[in-house]
Amino acid sequence: MSTPTSAGARIQANNIHLPFPRSTERMNNRKNYRGANLTTRRPIDTTTTKRQTKRIDFQKNSVAKSDTFPQKSIAWLEPGGTPLASKSAQRAHLLQALQLKHLKQLKQVRQVRQVRQTASSILKRSEHVQPSHRHITMSHMQKSSAYSTMDTNSKIASLSEVITMHRRAPGFHPGLMTDMYHPDSAYVSWLTGLNGLTTFDLYTRSAPFGGAYLLVAGLEAAMEFVQAFRYTPDEIKFLSHIRDYDSAFLDELASLRFTGEILALPEGSIAFPNEPLMRVTAPFREAILLEAGLLQTVNLATLIATKASRIVYAAQKGRPRRVAEFAFRRAQEPLTVARSSYIGGCASTSLLLAAYEYRLPATGTVPHALIELFPTEEEAFEAIANAYNRYTLLLDTYNPRNAIQTAIEVALRTQETLGHTLAAVRLDSGDIVADSIYIRDKLDRAGLSSVRILASGDLDEWKITELLEAGAAIDSFGVGTALGSGSGSPELGIPGGALGAVYKEVWYVDETGTEFPKVKIAGSKSTFPGKKEIYRHPQWEEDVIQLAHEPRPENYHRLFRPVMRNGEMIPGSLPPLSEVRELAQQNLEMLPARYRALTVEEPYPVRFSEGLQALRIQASQLVNKPVQE
């Protein structure tokens, strides 16, 4: 007979649902619990078998055993050891025991969840601060309530254990952040024994958004990915199910760690098409398995940083203006977008999580819903003005020209009575040019010339340029969708949305030490072989890409910086975010204006050395195909 949900309980091995009464008082008042003193009697389970399915049938007023119920007896004792003969008492005590067991398990589950959340939070914070700050001590961990409630043997004692817990969280599997053909390629390499030192270049063939340059970002996340790259036992098992890999190959993957060398352009650097942003040298299988993860981190971050720098540049026409990043609700990777936008020059973010993780300035205005919450616009403005010392009012919920008059009256009144200040007004729709001019005039006439006018609403660098060229009286901008998606301009036929960097093999050293230049022959997609360096003219007249062994051009600056050696991070190679942002702004100021423009007439000159060009011809002859320009 099925057990009614209101009175019964079904216990399963790993999934417990106990719809017990809320209190022992309620239990004693129920018919089935009469005569039971639940506060003084306890059951002792003398069985040694594992937990099995048990069912309590309350309609029969007895304990029913299923086929899998333990056959060993349960002794029911009073606190003093006297056996309990009453079946109702036995049933009630069994119920209490199950309830207590359930509560204990719930507590353990909560503790595990709290520790995992704590570990995740600590790891995320550690990923975005300079390496010298990434120390977690026992005293730090003991401040966590989840940590302090755990048994001594279960406590987390080191950052590596925190990382391990986080890596087990759903959705974080660095070893699986590859395309299917990467482990397939590694398997062919394993079968054939070809695993010599291989050099890959990560670069892009064109600049995004019809511009001339790229603002490099994403290196820190890329290096975190490299350091974390490994396969867990569950992931190895998964790979064994989707492909018939040899078990010895899977054993190698289980212990695989990156042992190679990485050189890269620092975050905040300016780069141009065909210049390697990163040079990776490692045994082939290690290097090939990193391809997709490195491209994903660098592609997105560099795209957004470049987009942000263009938007900020467009906003500076005539005088400085601040740009706030409002992209969270439209961004595919909001934290990456916020961090990269800050590198690109945005003054703040609307996303509190990003402000918390990266210590960014947070900013916000007012939603239309808050204005609509009140019977009248004046009451809404009054409530906002009363709540904050400095506040922003949204003017375009109904009619911005009526709203500005109401805003002025409220601002003057609350300034006199409370000392609160109207800091800004926001326009999100309508005729922003005409309305902003009208509003600026009204504010100035009312003696509120310090109040800024913020514009938002599907803006990008081209729309901002149009607004300012049309004479819009805007002091700052909030940009969301275009920034969060890195979109181009369909109206102007300018693509966007992806950077398109590639990761190409350029050099190979076999087990005998013989070196081989590697080249792809594919028209405009043909590659340049060899281990390269990049040098920049001090006045930004040109960049030179040459072979690593060629002498440096006189007075030119080397752009590559070593980041990782023998699989270990080089101290100081990842500066804090504030320094990255400062470097980016310095480089953007030095970039000649003709190359920083939204559209460029000619690309920045990047020259390939004679030695590099000769090696390309030599490598193409090795594969019996001439280079097609």
Residue ranges, per PLM feature:
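Short, intrinsically disordered low-complexity segments enriched in Ser/Thr with adjacent Pro
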Residues: 3, 7-12, 29, 36, ...
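Short hydrophobic targeting helices and cationic amphipathic motifs
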Residues: 18, 33-34, 38, 59-62, ...
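Intrinsically disordered, low-complexity repeat/linker tracts enriched for polar/charged residues
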Residues: 93-133
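Gly/Ser/Thr/Ala-enriched C-terminal appendages of enzymes
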Residues: 151-196, 200, 209-212, 444-446, ...
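Buried, small/hydrophobic-residue-enriched core segments of structured protein domains
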Residues: 151-197, 206-208, 244, 250-259, ...
